[in-house]
């Protein structure tokens, strides 16, 4: 309003001054220009008034309504996506990004319902044994056995078949199903595979354990040899998304890992593949990896949590919070409804040892000690899991 009055006053005084010095023809022209200027100013003034009313209407009515509707949509969308998954559908990346910001309690409750729909009360437990450790050729920045770690890790060659069988018999005394043999290095040599195969055959003969192996980037022929010895599943983590992988490791590639998984499936083996979380990745990286795993149709998905170890490049990283871990677990259950979501390394630093994850979509775990760090007691794990209503398969 003040702007319009100022313009009108300026035009009027200018007009009076010019007319006092102009001819009649020029005066008529100036008067016309004057009214045109007044018309333009009046139009702008009216437009400003309209815009002001629109802003007031948006702030007082539209914005509060949008906020209310969004809250309703969020609640309904979690349930809609849950129903979609339970009915056999698959969520999209956009759906997953939406869920990554949804209410955590509602998300975990829905994930638990999805898990029980597809698996009932079945729970899978795995134990690991380090059959060859130390002197790893790879430069994974999170690992204490890596070439870039400044930690004295005792190295040992491939253990004998006899010692392997003794370890397996001890594990067989517990109520566990899978027994995973893990080796350091980029890949196990053909000589070591021949050596370990005799031990695998003995385990299959003398125990009820299902043998898994984590022997690195093997080829289809090597996987077939392991399958003939009795191996049912191989482990090969993608670790993170394709985008972020070069920040974690440069001594081998993401494509090599995917090729290994494809080769194992061609050999008739199940695949256990997941990643490590809390290494600087974004939520989008976590989601991208989950969708890659879904495309690869893996059987089991380990969720490893970075346990910062002094002497590694990530030794000063802050561990993920319990809430972040619950969100990852629940989100993975939505994306991977028919896979075992396996809480793995890093459980020991959680206040409840990660048991709350077993009510948020996870239905499998690795128990006992890990490769280079202490884990959760097998007896404690099995007892608590059964008390939660699960049946260990």
Feature locations, PLM:
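Flexible, acidic/Gly-rich N-terminal and inter-domain linker regions that tether
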Residues: 17, 50-138
């Amino acid at each position: 309003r003040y702007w319009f009055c100022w313009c009108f006053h300026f035009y009027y005084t200018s007009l009076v001054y010019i007319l006092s010095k102009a001819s009649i023809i020029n005066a008529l022209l100036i008067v016309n220009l004057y009214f045109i200027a007044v018309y333009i100013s009046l139009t702008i003034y009216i437009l400003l008034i309209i815009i002001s009313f629109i802003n007031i209407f948006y702030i007082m009515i539209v914005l509060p309504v949008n906020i209310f509707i969004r809250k309703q949509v969020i609640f309904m969308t979690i349930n809609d996506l849950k129903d979609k998954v339970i009915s056999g559908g698959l969520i999209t990346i956009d759906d997953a990004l939406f869920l990554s910001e949804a209410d955590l309690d509602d998300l975990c409750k829905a994930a638990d319902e999805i898990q029980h729909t597809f698996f009932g009360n079945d729970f899978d437990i795995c134990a690991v044994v380090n059959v060859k450790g130390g002197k790893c050729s790879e430069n994974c920045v999170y690992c204490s056995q890596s070439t870039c770690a400044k930690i004295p890790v005792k190295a040992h060659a491939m253990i004998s078949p006899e010692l392997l069988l003794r370890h397996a018999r001890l594990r067989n005394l517990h109520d566990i199903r899978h027994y995973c043999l893990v080796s350091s290095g980029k890949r196990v040599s053909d000589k070591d595979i021949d050596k370990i195969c005799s031990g695998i055959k003995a385990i299959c003969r003398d125990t009820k354990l299902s043998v898994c192996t984590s022997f690195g980037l093997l080829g289809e022929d090597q996987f077939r040899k392991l399958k003939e010895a009795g191996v049912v599943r191989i482990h090969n983590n993608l670790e993170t998304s394709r985008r972020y992988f070069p920040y974690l490791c440069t001594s081998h590639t993401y494509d090599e890992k995917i090729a290994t998984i494809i080769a194992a499936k061609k050999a008739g083996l199940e695949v256990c593949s997941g990643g490590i979380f809390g290494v600087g990745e974004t939520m989008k990286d976590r989601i991208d990896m989950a969708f890659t795993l879904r495309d690869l149709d893996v059987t089991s998905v380990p969720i490893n949590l970075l346990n910062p170890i002094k002497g590694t490049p990530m030794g000063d990283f802050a561990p993920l919070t319990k809430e972040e871990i619950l969100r990852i677990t629940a989100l993975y259950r939505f994306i991977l409804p028919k896979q075992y979501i396996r809480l793995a390394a890093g459980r020991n630093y959680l206040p409840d040892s990660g048991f709350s994850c077993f009510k948020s979509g996870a239905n499998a775990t690795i128990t006992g000690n890990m490769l280079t760090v202490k884990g959760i007691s097998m007896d404690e794990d099995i007892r608590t899991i059964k008390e939660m209503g699960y049946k260990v398969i």
